[in-house]
Amino acid sequence: MKKNIGKILAVILVVSVLATVLCACVPSNFSKAEANLKANGYVAETLENGDIANGANAMAKLAAAAYDITLTGKCDNIVTGVSEDGKQSVTIYYFDNAKDAKAFNKACKADLKKAKDELKKQKDAGNISEDDYKKALEEMKDVKFGVSGKAFYYGTKAAVKACN
């Protein structure tokens, strides 16, 4: 009986880990991400290199400069999607290497921590109310970002889900 419980728990653990991994990522193919967004009612567009003089790579370099990141490779495609009401959005950078995607993810984590720290500091100083503080934290919870292979994504949870 104990052996069966252990096996059952192991299967449940594997299934839950796989579900998390498979649901938390964006497609590795930019065309599929754009198609999925459109199928879910989003206005979606892809910026590729060659469209506007290597536009995807140029936009990624601008974003990297804002985060003080040095790119080691190039960005091949950027997919953006916005819901019809404008409340949900996602941007996905498809790099030629995972190192650049991870660098963007690390920078976003650091920025989120800074934003939360500053928000708490403003609340503690009495510059914002407790209700405004809680509301801002709730809004931050709706933002999702991460790495999926060589892609870095950020946006609202609903928009990231619409990519899949």
Regions found by a protein language model. Give the residues of each.
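Gram-positive cell-envelope targeting signals
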Residues: 1-33
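N-terminal "mature-domain start" segment
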Residues: 25-76, 160-164
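Extracytoplasmic/secreted envelope proteins and their assembly/folding machinery
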Residues: 30, 34, 101-105, 109
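A short acidic-to-branched-hydrophobic micro-motif
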Residues: 80-104
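Short amphipathic alpha-helices in soluble, non-transmembrane regions
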Residues: 107-111, 163-164
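A short, solvent-exposed beta-edge/loop patch
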Residues: 120-164
